[in-house]
């Protein structure tokens, strides 16, 4: 299948012949007739003119799962975040639902014995994720379940796809594996499959496979602008891929952190191929990208406040340098202000409690 994505960047638009778009004239306001502090004086007026809101409806809680029973495993690099066995997951999710958080995202930390060169455990119909999805949808049918589509938790080398003899990730061969993984999630009952692998063409391939299999209501959240960031370290500890990846990197498929226009091309392609939502990852260091994506496309735009962002905030808070609650709320509000519709954040549960107060 061939997909056509068409858009012009703001820079390109400025060079379109006969473009009649004119810049908006600045307001003419002067002191003392205008005193900007007047509207900031009282809490009621600050609230009345607040431009951006953060509610539990904007929150998605990423959750890590492991095999076994009675497991709540702490993650040293991510304070207060745990890996859950399925029985403990059900207890934790009951609290999430009670707090009004609309969706969770599942990330597996599979046993080392289940890993392989091709990551075939990823599409095992009785795999960890697939069993978790079935159990969750049975008990919490209204909760949105998002599943990660990528091979890195399941490969012995820690890459997101299938590699050749030189360690290079093979794009088109990997697509077949991603299709099988996404279909296994949809068949288990996942509401949203979220390809985070950054292979070219994977959104179109997965969308076509879902349609052909009758999963017409399964949504796709595309990790469209996923950067080869240094902020992912604690996450890789959580899913057990750090040791597998070793000194390797993902620069041949994740985006260069220096690039901005490239993100718009990635988003345009994913939307053309059938993505329902797009994502920018990481969050706060990439708010310029969030704003550009939202302004350019107006599509549902999600942001992942990643493990490194969470770890930095928590480290500063634990040392008494920052107020944990205040910076958690501020960071998420800033992501919303940049244009995010929803945010995957490890602060979701804590912030939901704060918002309830």
Where do the PLM segments sit?
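An N-cap/entry alpha-helix motif that binds or orients negatively charged groups
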Residues: 17, 22-87
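Ala/Thr-enriched low-complexity intrinsically disordered regions
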Residues: 5, 9-11, 20-25
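Alpha/beta enzyme core
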Residues: 58-60, 67-357
């Amino acid at each position: 299948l061939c997909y056509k994505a068409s858009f012009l960047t703001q820079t390109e638009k400025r060079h379109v012949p006969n473009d009649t778009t004119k810049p908006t004239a600045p307001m003419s306001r002067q002191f003392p007739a205008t005193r900007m502090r007047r509207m900031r004086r009282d809490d009621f007026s600050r609230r009345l003119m607040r431009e951006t809101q953060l509610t539990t409806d904007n929150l998605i809680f990423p959750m890590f799962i492991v095999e076994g029973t009675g497991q709540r495993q702490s993650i040293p690099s991510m304070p207060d975040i745990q890996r859950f066995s399925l029985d403990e997951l059900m207890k934790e999710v009951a609290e999430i639902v009670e707090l009004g958080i609309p969706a969770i995202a599942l990330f597996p930390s599979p046993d080392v014995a289940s890993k392989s060169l091709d990551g075939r455990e990823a599409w095992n119909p009785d795999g960890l994720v697939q069993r978790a999805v079935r159990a969750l949808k049975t008990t919490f049918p209204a909760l949105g379940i998002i599943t990660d589509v990528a091979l890195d938790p399941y490969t012995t080398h820690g890459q997101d796809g299938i590699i050749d003899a030189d360690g290079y990730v093979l794009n088109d061969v990997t697509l077949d594996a991603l299709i099988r993984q996404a279909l296994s999630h949809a068949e288990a009952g996942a509401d949203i499959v979220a390809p985070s692998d950054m292979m070219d063409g994977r959104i179109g391939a997965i969308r076509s496979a879902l349609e052909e299999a009758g999963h017409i209501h399964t949504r796709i959240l595309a990790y469209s602008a996923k950067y080869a960031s240094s902020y992912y370290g604690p996450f890789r500890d959580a899913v057990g891929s750090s040791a597998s990846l070793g000194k390797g990197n993902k620069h041949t498929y994740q985006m260069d952190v220096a690039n901005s226009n490239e993100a718009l091309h990635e988003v345009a392609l994913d939307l053309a191929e059938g993505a329902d939502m797009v994502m920018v990852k990481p969050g706060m260091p990439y708010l310029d990208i969030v704003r550009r994506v939202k302004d350019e496309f107006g599509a549902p735009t999600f942001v992942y406040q990643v493990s490194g962002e969470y770890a930095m905030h928590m480290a500063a808070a634990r040392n008494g340098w920052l107020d944990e609650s205040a910076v958690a709320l501020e960071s998420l509000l800033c992501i919303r202000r940049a244009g995010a519709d929803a945010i995957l954040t490890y602060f979701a549960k804590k912030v939901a409690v704060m918002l309830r107060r």
